[in-house]
UniProtKB/Swiss-Prot annotation:
This is CUGBP Elav-like family member 4. Belongs to the CELF/BRUNOL family. It holds the Pfam family RRM_1. InterPro entries: CELF3/4/5/6_RRM1 (IPR034648), Nucleotide-bd_a/b_plait_sf (IPR012677), RBD_domain_sf (IPR035979), RRM_dom (IPR000504). It comes from Macaca fascicularis (Crab-eating macaque). Residues 228-247 are annotated as: Necessary for TNNT2 exon 5 inclusion. One of its GO terms (biological process) is RNA splicing. Residues 18-28 have a biased composition (Polar residues). Residues 18-41 are annotated as: Disordered. The gene is CELF4. Keywords: Activator, Cytoplasm, mRNA processing, mRNA splicing, Nucleus, Repeat, RNA-binding. PROSITE patterns: RRM.
Amino acid sequence: MYIKMATLANGQADNASLSTNGLGSSPGSAGHMNGLSHSPGNPSTIPMKDHDAIKLFIGQIPRNLDEKDLKPLFEEFGKIYELTVLKDRFTGMHKGCAFLTYCERESALKAQSALHEQKTLPGMNRPIQVKPADSESRGDRKLFVGMLNKQQSEDDVRRLFEAFGNIEECTILRGPDGNSKGCAFVKYSSHAEAQAAINALHGSQTMPGASSSLVVKFADTDKERTMRRMQQMAGQMGMFNPMAIPFGAYGAYAQALMQQQAALMASVAQGGYLNPMAAFAAAQMQQMAALNMNGLAAAPMTPTSGGSTPPGITAPAVPSIPSPIGVNGFTGLPPQANGQPAAEAVFANGIHPYPAQSPTAADPLQQAYAGVQQYAGPAYPAAYGQISQAFPQPPPMIPQQQREGPEGCNLFIYHLPQEFGDAELMQMFLPFGFVSFDNPASAQTAIQAMNGFQIGMKRLKVQLKRPKDANRPY
């Protein structure tokens, strides 16, 4: 019996046909692999595998066991087509896992049933893992069928799909009232049969009462459904909008601005006239709120008419609310000479220093406004004073000491975007337990779902935090 085997080391695959009869190599032997001799590759001796053969992932393997050591354990369940121990492509270090493909599908099923979580190899703390690899474990025999006639029964759907192979399951999705939702799941006995049904039926016809043509595709796996839920949740948090990330906190700010604008306009309207300063402030609010609603930082509006507001005044909305004017980490105006912050300088001496970019353009304006006092004071500060009382400063955040879960429950996450904080992390990982998990099962579930999860331009790398006595925590 000849077995195709390969060892992945430094990114290279070494394929050879190995003799398993315990004898040495033939005179024409071309070399050795892992201490075993092999004969020259003869195409007639290369084993063939079933079209629906399953590729198995083997986990919890001692790092001192190679293909030649693992082969006797697995070949009792059938003829092996390929056995590959995974090694680091850079260091050549054994990763403690392997891929195994039998020539026959039944052999893989028997091996999984007999070994998975049933036997612990020497030197390991957990039993061996034998399960379909990710590429095989997806529901590649199970189809989702959409745009069905809601009057169709399971028997009708079976008759539609039975021409392509043996159907193991057929289920129509129904609502609480028992009525069909117009979709179903159909499970074949092999991937090839399911693929044939997709090729023949997807988009081929429109069922009576359906709004579009028939939909036939592979059903999502649990992992894919989890990822979709996470992406939807992350999208609601604004994580995938590159402009919303830095400024998402201003959503409430923008809403407050809109409310304050309405109150301000009502206040000045009661006085029977529109104070120029109040009008400018209201317009400034509207501009900032509109921009913030779109997730963009607001830039102060500069008046263009010569008779309304001095050019140096760029009034923020309310002193009691932090101004969002400051993009990409740049802060606003520096503190003024009289000790008042820049955000309140407009209430102090009336006019900010005007940085003249063009002396010929700026000097006449400065001369024109040199003797102008602050516009009628009461309306502008008074209106803001009334409004700002409704928006008190939030109490200062008291930093809390970081807490850790028990050993084996703490995750270390690489490649986080710089703008991520504890709140964003908690929202992302909350469905799997808590940020520090209280049990290993939740931590492992989070790793499976979130490792490789893409946020913006980066993919998360999530793994168990190493023990405290290790040289580094990750």
